[in-house]
């Protein structure tokens, strides 16, 4: 994977629940075959791996081997992603953070899958959590949360937010498909 054009900042890449499921599938294909039903088949096809239409142990093992080979250096990239990134009073995560806990006390499962209080209870500690996972029609800022998941997988609109000291957050959204 090659990224160019970054002159001011070093990019940080976060792990999401689907990446975690893929890594678990690669480790234990029979136990983690559920991944195939939630984007795994599409991932296999995107890497040129025939979809595992059979769910038997041999088919799953073959899919696992083919995917591991097809991923090549992308596997190292995914394994090196972070669960969270903290910069000042901004915590970037895939899904959520428990509003009752500080950034250093968060559970990885919450960071990747969410927390029941995350959208219902505003943060009271001054921390802002930038997150995806929960699709919003438009990017939003509320309750110590900055939501940027505009449903790219179905809307074609991918959103990011630029946060700079002394400036208002600036959303960048593709036009979609």
Question: What residue spans do the PLM features occupy?
Answer:
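Core catalytic region of metal-dependent phosphoesterases/phosphodiesterases
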Residues: 1-37
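Acidic, His/Gly-enriched loop-helix segments that form or flank divalent-metal centers
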Residues: 38-147, 151-157, 163-176
